[in-house]
A protein has these predicted regions:
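Bacterial extracytoplasmic/cell-wall-associated proteins, especially those involved in peptidoglycan
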Residues: 2-89
Length: 89
């Protein structure tokens, strides 16, 4: 899959959600990424929080434990990033 996005045009929220999807579903393919996106959406709905708040809540998604957005942005360069970004939007 060709990379069609440019990181400069992505919002902080989109990056955080896509990175969460990519990191938590690593190796699981599109079904796994879809499942992580569904968990984020469901938690946001149930807890009346933004998806970003859900992703960054301590110990909810292990990829963020002790990590920053800058330290994980490299994930947006993997081939699966386009699908994760589409789900994040």
């Amino acid at each position: 899959m060709a990379h069609t996005h440019t990181n400069a045009k992505l919002t902080r929220e989109t990056k955080i959600i896509a990175i969460t999807i990519l990191a938590e579903a690593r190796g699981e393919g599109e079904k796994g990424m879809y499942a992580v996106a569904a968990v984020i959406a469901q938690r946001a709905f149930e807890r009346k929080r933004t998806p970003t708040e859900v992703c960054l809540k301590p110990y909810q998604f292990s990829c963020w434990n002790g990590k920053s957005l800058k330290s994980l942005e490299h994930l947006l360069k993997v081939p699966q990033a386009d699908y994760a970004l589409a789900l994040a939007k």
